[in-house]
Amino acid sequence: MLLLAAAGLVAFVLLLYMVSPLISPKPLALPGAHVVVTGGSSGIGKCIAIECYKQGAFITLVARNEDKLLQAKKDIEKHSINDKQVVLCISVDVSQDYNQVENVIKQAQEKLGPVDMLVNCAGTSMSGKFEELEVSSFEKLMSINYLGSVYPSRAVITTMKERRVGRIVFVSSQAGQLGLFGFTAYSSSKFAIRGLAEALQMEVKPYNVYVTVAYPPDTDTPGLAEENKTKPLETRLISETTAICKPEQVAKQIVKDAIQGNFNSSIGSDGYMLSSLTCGMAPVTSITEGLQQVVTMGLFRTIALFYLGSFDNIVRRCMVQKAKPEVVDKTA
């Protein structure tokens, strides 16, 4: 009886693997496709542009700094696979004026054709204790990280729906899945992206447009180097419990998931566990993905409790360490 049940389970899993591709999105062909990357002048955004260019795409880079854009353009063009490929640079702040963003997207489409994939990678980070952060910091991060993704997406969505093809990628963060000490402003802006993405996916799925949310861990980029200058001790120690990833590795995974139309894009085993743990009511791309989430949830939640306990211990140790000089002063 037990053997029969095991055989039935194996047969069921095999059936899921066979049926899953039939309900999954058709992969997006990158050769000749027009890919727009915001925040594409450095870091993960630039590496995503390179990865798409290596697969034959036409690239529009969007960022604020013209000098960095031109340097990124030169770096990307080294990876061309044919002489027809083009890298277009547009200098604009995607978080300030929707009409301006819409106009530059129209200009890009006039030159390189309709946008097949939009990668929202423009973003910034700021850390500090909740009561020590300026209120303007919360406004700034919501403007850049959230509205800086809303505006470009709004500018391309109508054409994608009309053509019934497209990919929209939102680059969030593991801090957009798990709230951490020092990231009250940053995490909230990254959590907002997921809510936007889930609602948008439900709207555009009937039009064969698919949304991907990427949750990269700490990545070796200029942005991380700048963030580390002011990062609280507690935040730094918690961050050091996981390895720093290379931007090329992160970019390759994001592009792969976007092509496949996967809603979640995670990096490494920790990223996979975190995405499974926080899946909630998020869309799934395949039956197999949903089954994996159901099967692993209990185990991953158990592991997560140990992580949370470790993080709380780090915060307590730092508090005790900071309190010691005060105790010495009172007894002196």
From Swiss-Prot:
Gene3D superfamilies assigned: NAD(P)-binding Rossmann-like Domain
Binding locations of NADPH: G39, S41, S42, G43, R64, K68, D93
Protein location: Endoplasmic reticulum membrane
Record field: transmembrane: 271-291, 294-314
Signal peptide: 1-25
Amino acids binding NADP(+): Y186, K190
Alphabetical UniProt keywords: Endoplasmic reticulum, Lipid metabolism, Membrane, NADP, Nucleotide-binding, Oxidoreductase, Proto-oncogene, Signal, Sphingolipid metabolism, Transmembrane, Transmembrane helix
Annotated metabolic or biological route of this protein: Lipid metabolism; sphingolipid metabolism
Membrane-topology descriptor: Multi-pass membrane protein
Keyword Transferase tagged: no
GO biological process: 3-keto-sphinganine metabolic process; sphingolipid biosynthetic process
Sequence ranges on the Lumenal membrane side: 292-293
Cytoplasmic-side positions: 26-270, 315-332
Residue positions of the active site: S172 (proton donor), Y186 (proton acceptor), K190 (lowers pka of active site tyr)
Family affiliation: Belongs to the short-chain dehydrogenases/reductases (SDR) family.
Role according to the record: Catalyzes the reduction of 3'-oxosphinganine (3-ketodihydrosphingosine/KDS) to sphinganine (dihydrosphingosine/DHS), the second step of de novo sphingolipid biosynthesis.
Protein name per Swiss-Prot or TrEMBL: 3-ketodihydrosphingosine reductase
Organism whose genome encodes this protein: Mus musculus (Mouse)
